[in-house]
Every structure is written in structure tokens, then in C-alpha cells.
């Protein structure tokens, strides 16, 4: 955590997103500057883990999950602002025992807050991942209109982003959480989903579980770069060929 204005908005979105679903907030801070001034104002009900150095997304996520006890775990980036009912929708999906992971339908911020190209403002940022003919994982329909029929048809997917991922704690424990082999982060969420799929569980995107994603806002503020190319090669060396060319199912 580091972009405290976004973290504040993220936290403020939780009550309406959860509705009558009880939840516990666990924040893992990777040695953010000026953090004490912010965290001193937090409610005492929030569990705070302060790392003495930037451990990266993977280890921070694992540490946060380990502190909790609930049967469901929601991994949520501090740069994601949830819409009302999003958490409740995801929790309800787990009434189906075949569901192992539930992802979200995330959109780019509107133009006045956009950090990227204006053409993507308010459009799809994430609605699941698939593989292309080369075995590379990519985000489905990124930059498309939210209400496009093909976007709305997405349901069962190969993987979802760890920016907003809910899973069963028993699966998380069996798998061992996110794999530290991916360093500070990138593709650990994909590998987690593939492990869940290998356990004969389904990965879905709930079209009604929505939110805004400012995509790596904190990492950009503090000049943290993710090893995209290296981790992509690592992912393909470990999983290449098992799920070839799944994108055709969504087009």
C-alpha cells in the first residue's frame, strides 16, 4: 500500500460492497512512506501488518491471508474501488461447491481520473484471462464497452486477476497461496487459478461483482516495476501446452 487516497476510497467502498456479509479487513503495508500518519487514523477493527521492506505483492498477499480465519479470502488491491453489492455477489457464488475462484468485472476510471489512454476511460479493464495461440495469457476484451454482448457472455474462464480475487481458504491452504517463485508479482494469480482448475474446480467472473481499477497506481507512484517478460517466460515453462489457445471460446 502506498497511494493512500486510493486506499481510503477502497476502504470506504467495502461496507456497501459487502452489505450484510460480515468481513474482516487485513491491510499489508510494504514499507510505504508516511504510512504512520495514515494508519494512526484507522479504525481499531482493521488488522494491520507493517512490513519493514517492500516484500512485493506475492509475499504480502500470503502474509495477509495467513492472518485471517474466514472460509473465504478476498484478495483486493488498494487501487480497486468496489461497487455496491460486489462482495456479497462473490460470496453468494460459493454456494455452488464446484466454484473455486470468483473474479470481478473491473473497469478503467472515467476520463477525469484516468491514468492511461483516454479511449479506455470507463471501459473493460478486466473480465478474465485466456491464452492465445502462442500460449500467452492476456486479459479478455480489454478496452471494450462494458455492455458489449461478448463481454457480458464471459462466465467460466481460465484465470482472473489477483486485484480482485475471492477463493476458498481450504484451497488456498492446500495450494500454498501465491507462488513466491514469481518474485514481487505478476502471473502468481494466474498460476493460482490454474492450480485450482487442476483440482477440478471452476474459475468464474461474476458480471455483477464490479469495480474501478486504477491499475498499478501505487507501483507507478513509487517506481516499482513488475518483471512481466521474465515471469511470462517462467509461467510458460511451467504451464505451457496445458491450456493452448483458449481465447477462441470467448470470440
Task: Enumerate the predicted regions with their spans.
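A short, conserved alpha-helix in the catalytic core of glycosyltransferases
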Residues: 89-90, 156-176, 181-210
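C-terminal, non-catalytic tails of nucleotide-sugar-dependent glycosyltransferases
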Residues: 100-101, 110-111, 129-156, 166, ...
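Short aromatic/hydrophobic "clamp" motif used to bind/position activated sugar donors
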Residues: 73
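Conserved donor NDP-sugar-binding/catalytic core segment of glycosyltransferases
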Residues: 81-132
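Short, well-formed alpha-helical segments that are part of the catalytic scaffolds
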Residues: 3-16
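Acidic donor-binding segment of Leloir-type glycosyltransferases
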Residues: 14-53
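Acidic metal-phosphate-binding loop of nucleotide-sugar-dependent transferases
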Residues: 32, 55, 79-81
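Glycine-rich, basic loop-to-helix element that forms the pyrophosphate-binding segment
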Residues: 50-68
Amino acid at each position: 500500500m502506498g497511494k493512500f487516497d486510493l486506499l481510503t476510497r477502497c476502504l470506504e467502498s467495502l461496507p456497501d460492497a459487502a452489505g450484510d456479509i460480515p468481513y474482516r479487513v487485513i491491510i499489508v503495508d510494504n514499507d510505504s512512506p508516511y504510512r504512520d500518519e495514515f494508519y494512526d487514523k484507522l479504525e481499531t477493527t482493521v488488522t494491520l501488518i507493517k512490513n519493514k521492506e517492500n516484500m512485493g505483492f506475492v509475499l504480502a498477499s500470503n502474509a495477509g491471508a495467513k492472518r485471517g480465519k474466514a472460509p473465504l479470502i478476498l484478495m483486493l488491491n488498494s487501487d480497486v474501488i468496489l461497487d455496491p453489492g460486489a462482495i456479497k455477489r462473490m460470496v453468494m457464488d460459493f454456494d455452488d461447491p464446484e466454484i473455486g475462484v470468483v473474479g470481478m468485472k473491473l473497469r478503467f476510471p472515467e476520463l477525469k481520473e484516468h491514468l492511461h489512454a483516454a479511449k479506455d476511460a470507463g471501459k473493460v479493464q478486466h473480465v478474465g484471462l485466456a491464452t492465445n495461440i502462442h500460449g500467452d495469457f492476456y486479459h479478455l476484451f480489454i478496452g471494450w464497452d462494458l455492455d458489449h454482448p461478448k463481454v457480458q457472455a464471459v462466465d467460466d474462464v481460465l484465470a482472473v486477476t489477483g486485484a480482485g480475487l475471492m477463493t476458498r481458504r481450504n484451497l488456498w491452504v492446500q495450494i500454498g497461496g501465491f507462488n513466491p517463485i514469481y518474485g514481487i508479482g505478476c502471473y502468481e494469480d494466474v498460476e493460482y487459478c490454474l492450480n485450482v482448475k487442476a483440482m477440478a474446480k471452476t474459475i468464474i467472473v461474476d458480471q455483477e461483482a464490479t469495480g474501478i481499477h486504477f491499475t498499478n497506481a501505487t507501483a507507478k507512484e513509487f517506481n516499482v516495476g513488475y518483471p512481466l517478460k521474465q515471469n511470462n517466460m517462467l509461467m510458460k515453462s511451467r504451464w505451457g501446452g496445458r491450456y493452448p489457445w483458449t481465447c477462441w471460446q470467448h470470440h
